[in-house]
């Protein structure tokens, strides 16, 4: 990671054959720390989660932004607009989430054990500066179940059989943002590109659902 930052800060110091990347990093670091030397580019970085910006998928990526140092530009990354805390409160404190999806109290699942303490904390708070994370249910609940309804006229919304859960690949819960979706050679691939229903059963996301997510 540090090597990438140094390379972006000093792109003029390229690697010299047969120099290894470790040797190149050492030379970049020495150049960077020399007081008489100034970075060619000012580089800022931050780890961002797509779910924090309204995407119904937890997808974390590191973003690098660089400007020529002589421009004096100061970059600020955007602040999150959505949060897990607001989602938990929406689901387990106010219940507005279930009301929006017209799910009666008897049909609502129990709060996961891992969020019990968080729910208790959020119950004391009345104001949030962010919107709840968008969930899989938020994104695809208006689409018919492709396993039971096959004549719907929606493009790329066909059931793909064969989904199964195994350690490390359990699918995306309906009432959370989807796990990171991955591309594959056969439409929507397996692994984490599955929906896990409240009863524990799984099925593959259709291509249309994956596009929504």
Where are each of the predicted segments found?
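Class I S-adenosyl-L-methionine
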Residues: 1-174
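Generic structural motif recognizing short loop/turn segments at the entrances and edges of beta-strands
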Residues: 39-41, 71-73, 177, 191-193, ...
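A broadly conserved detector of short glycine/acidic/proline-rich loop/turn motifs that flank catalytic sites
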Residues: 68, 185-187, 209
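Internal, well-ordered alpha-helical scaffold/interface segments
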Residues: 138-141, 179, 211
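Internal helical hairpin/lid segments
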Residues: 161-195
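Low-complexity, glycine/alanine/valine/leucine- and proline-rich hydrophobic stretches
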Residues: 195-213
């Amino acid at each position: 990671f540090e090597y990438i930052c140094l390379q972006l800060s000093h792109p003029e110091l390229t690697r010299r054959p047969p120099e290894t990347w470790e040797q190149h990093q050492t030379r970049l670091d020495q150049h960077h720390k020399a007081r008489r030397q100034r970075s060619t580019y000012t580089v800022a970085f931050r780890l961002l989660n797509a779910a924090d910006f309204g995407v119904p998928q937890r997808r974390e990526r590191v973003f690098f932004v660089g400007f020529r140092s002589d421009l004096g530009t100061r970059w600020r990354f955007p602040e999150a607009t959505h949060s897990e805390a607001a989602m938990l409160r929406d689901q387990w404190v106010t219940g507005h989430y279930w009301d929006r999806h017209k799910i009666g109290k008897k049909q609502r699942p129990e709060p996961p054990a891992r969020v019990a303490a968080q729910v208790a904390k959020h119950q004391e708070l009345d104001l949030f500066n962010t919107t709840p994370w968008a969930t899989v249910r938020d994104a695809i609940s208006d689409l018919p179940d492709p396993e039971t309804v096959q004549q719907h006229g929606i493009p790329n919304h066909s059931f793909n059989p064969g989904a199964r859960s195994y350690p490390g690949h359990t699918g995306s819960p309906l009432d959370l943002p989807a796990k990171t979706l991955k591309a594959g050679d056969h439409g929507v691939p397996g692994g984490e590109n599955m929906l896990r229903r409240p009863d524990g059963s799984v099925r593959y996301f259709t291509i249309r659902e994956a596009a929504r997510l």
